[in-house]
Amino acid sequence: MSQDLLPGVTGVLALADGAILQGVGCGAVGDAVGEVCFNTAMTGYQEILTDPSYMAQIVAFTFPHVGNVGVNGEDVEQITGVAETAARGALFRDVPTVQANWRADGDFDAWMKARGVVGLAGVDTRALTRKIRETGMPHGVIAHSPDGQFDLAALVAKAKAWAGLEGLDLAKDASTTQTFTWDEGLWSWPEGYAKLDKPKYEVVVIDYGVKRNILRALAHVGARATVVPASTSAEDILARNPDGVMLSNGPGDPAATGQYAVPEIQKLVASGKPVFGICLGHQMLALALGAKTVKMEQGHHGANHPVKDLTTGKVEIVSMNHGFTVDTASLPAPVKETHVSLFDGTNAGIALDGKPVFSVQHHPEASPGPTDSLYLFERFAGLMDAAK
């Protein structure tokens, strides 16, 4: 079916509804299947593409110019180093530009090749974003072939056959398999990343696909993180006698991961230890407290999302990256809603009455994005102080 393509086309996106987007292939040669979403951030493409929360997804960047600051070894959010546990494809309006930044130590296109990320440039990302906004996040296959040869019918069939994210426990693949400690803090100019010399708190982080900047933000408030696999039991965690427990972000369906994680989270909540959940960790805490989660039509992906803190009345601009949400109507009486999205009114935070337990749907650690809600790590530290 290559005759259906325009001259010079070396990349396509085939959607499950039969739509074909044409352009110039970049990054890795080959194809990848996943859920197509859009991200509205203007910066931070390297952090986005290495965020484990994007596992099994193809990201369309709404900002047209990508690649101008290159890539480096510091802005990688994964801790596992397994490229397959992050975004598998990327869509751009313009061909990625040549880097010009003092921190760059590599070319974006070559970096995508090395990581196996299939790219497609020259796409009408505005039209694709409107399509996603109106009809939901489609299943798609992104393909790059330098000779311009594609079996379009086979690509569409592959997109149709993909089962999607619902029911998928991806956290087990994104998680570390070995326990380790972390003591690197947040970055600042001109010092670079801080070093935690004298930890004030010991925090166990359950890794469902944790971002490095969450660990750095913990170090910023004096917490040394011990990162454990997603399947770690509550008994093993409590045996370490931590000051608090962090439920990390991660990919996939929270209900699927919750099959083994929720019973352990319930034990941690019952222990009285301070618990702080972020993104997937927020959703699984909600499940552990008796609420439900549901799949979203278009999800929230970007660094410009307004969220209201109902406890203070303050509006914050935050980073979000999720395709599932907590069903507010399902929250049981002891659980109060603390944050809401001002885009669509969906839940963005909860707290448990009478317990040092809370979580948020957004990413207070940013990377990329604003740091309006970085104070939540201080709130967590305050709960650990009170519990000592």
From Swiss-Prot:
Residues 202-388 form the Glutamine amidotransferase type-1 domain. L-glutamine binds at S53, G250, G252, L280, Q283, N321, G323, F324. SUPFAM superfamilies: Carbamoyl phosphate synthetase, small subunit N-terminal domain, Class I glutamine amidotransferase-like. Residues 1-198 are annotated as: CPSase. Its EC number is 6.3.5.5. It holds the Pfam family GATase. Keywords: Amino-acid biosynthesis, Arginine biosynthesis, ATP-binding, Glutamine amidotransferase, Ligase, Nucleotide-binding, Pyrimidine biosynthesis. InterPro entries: Anth_synth/Amidotransfase (IPR050472), CarbamoylP_synth_ssu (IPR006274), CarbamoylP_synth_ssu_N (IPR002474), CarbP_synth_ssu_N_sf (IPR036480), Class_I_gatase-like (IPR029062), CPSase_GATase1 (IPR035686), GATASE (IPR017926). The active site is at C279 (nucleophile), H363, E365. Pathway: Amino-acid biosynthesis; L-arginine biosynthesis; carbamoyl phosphate from bicarbonate: step 1/1; Pyrimidine metabolism; UMP biosynthesis via de novo pathway; (S)-dihydroorotate from bicarbonate: step 1/3. NCBIfam families: CPSaseIIsmall (TIGR01368), PRK12838.1 (NF009475). Small subunit of the glutamine-dependent carbamoyl phosphate synthetase (CPSase). CPSase catalyzes the formation of carbamoyl phosphate from the ammonia moiety of glutamine, carbonate, and phosphate donated by ATP, constituting the first step of 2 biosynthetic pathways, one leading to arginine and/or urea and the other to pyrimidine nucleotides. The small subunit (glutamine amidotransferase) binds and cleaves glutamine to supply the large subunit with the substrate ammonia. This is Carbamoyl phosphate synthase small chain. It comes from Caulobacter vibrioides (strain ATCC 19089 / CIP 103742 / CB 15). The gene is carA.
